[in-house]
Curated annotation (Swiss-Prot):
Organism of this sequence: Afipia carboxidovorans (strain ATCC 49405 / DSM 1227 / KCTC 32145 / OM5) (Oligotropha carboxidovorans)
InterPro entries in UniProt: P-loop_NTPase (IPR027417), PanK (IPR004566), PRK/URK (IPR006083)
PANTHER family: URIDINE KINASE
Example GO biological process: coenzyme A biosynthetic process
Name this protein carries in UniProt: Pantothenate kinase
Similarity remark: Belongs to the prokaryotic pantothenate kinase family.
Length: 318
């Protein structure tokens, strides 16, 4: 019979309590002000100086080692091959469920990494911009699958990442509006040779079926040098989603331009019932079928408790 100690020996991750992880900050300086941190967290997410000090500064320090090692390897390979390739951006993926706080993590990392010395250029995109338009999804009968892998323009996203990794200039990505719940026509953002690119999205760690003929099939995560999965229990995620829905009912949904404006007048009870219906019909299914199964593919897992605070950190062994 295999013992717990033996199983731990074969665990691909080293797991740290919050207290253990916080000590790994060492002497990494705090480069963010309290008012900056306050602006970074998403609706109802929790972020304060203590969270940055104990979770994100150690992660920033770790990433500095990874990025430096990647640059040294790139230079060594360039000398070995006797080529003069452009410097390739270091790409970090941030994955996790709806309402888990991916955007908060991505923004904090962008701010911290941009203040390394020397000042690297750090850009951030979300994969929301690569969703198919609502018109396309409606024609394809996929509106209830929005956020599922099949709702994305995967070809466009892979082309974007390939161009970024190749060091091309002025690479453009579509823009998504959370107000209208749709792609913004004729609007793009420009990514111009960043030193580091952070890519945030639900399914960025997902793979697909490999073809029987053995032909190479690229996945989004093939372009990542490091990846972070933000984790929380399913029951916790459900409560966060419902709470966010009620908050949006009182704020963004009140805008007549909002796709969800029809929910602005719902009572608390009716709004919660609608939120749970959407969660159970769409987000929970996507979590179980597509998002959660990608967790073991992450380089680092941040496990949050019900108070939005990271309780445990797991780092994949080299």
């Amino acid at each position: 019979m295999t013992t717990g100690a033996e199983l731990q020996k074969y665990d691909p991750y080293r797991t740290f309590t919050r207290e253990q992880w916080a000590k790994l900050r060492d002497d990494t300086p705090m480069t963010l002000r309290a008012e900056e941190i306050e602006r970074m967290h998403s609706m109802l997410d929790r972020l304060d100086i203590k969270e940055v000090e104990e979770i994100y500064l150690p992660l920033s320090r770790l990433l500095s080692f990874y990025v430096s090692a990647a640059r040294r390897l790139f230079e060594s390979e360039r000398r070995f091959l006797r080529i003069r390739d452009r410097k390739m951006p270091y790409i970090i993926g941030v994955a996790g469920s709806v309402a888990v706080g991916k955007s908060t993590t991505a923004r904090v990392l962008q701010a911290l990494l941009a203040r390394w010395s020397p000042k690297p250029k750090v850009d951030l995109i979300t994969t929301d911009g690569f969703l198919h338009s609502n018109a396309y999804l409606e024609r394809a009968g996929l509106m209830d699958k929005k956020g599922f892998p099949e709702s994305y323009n995967l070809g466009a996203l892979l082309t974007f990442l390939s161009d970024i990794k190749a060091g091309r200039r002025d690479v453009r990505a579509p823009v998504y509006s959370h107000l209208t719940y749709d792609i913004v026509p004729n609007e793009t953002i420009e990514i111009d040779q960043p030193d580091i690119l952070i890519v945030e999205g639900l399914n960025v760690l997902q793979t697909g079926r490999l073809p029987a003929d053995g032909k190479a099939v690229p996945f989004i995560s093939d372009f990542f040098d490091f990846s972070v999965y933000i984790d929380a229990d399913e029951s916790t995620l459900q409560e966060w989603y419902a709470a966010r829905f009620l908050k949006l009912r009182d704020t963004a949904f009140s805008d007549p331009r909002s796709y969800f404006h029809r929910y602005a007048g719902l009572s608390d009870e009716a709004a919660r019932e609608k939120a749970l219906s959407i969660w159970n019909k769409i987000n929970r299914v996507n979590l179980r079928e597509n998002v959660l199964p990608t967790r073991p593919r992450a380089t680092l897992i941040l496990k949050k408790g019900s108070d939005h605070v990271v309780e445990r950190v797991s780092l994949r062994r080299l």
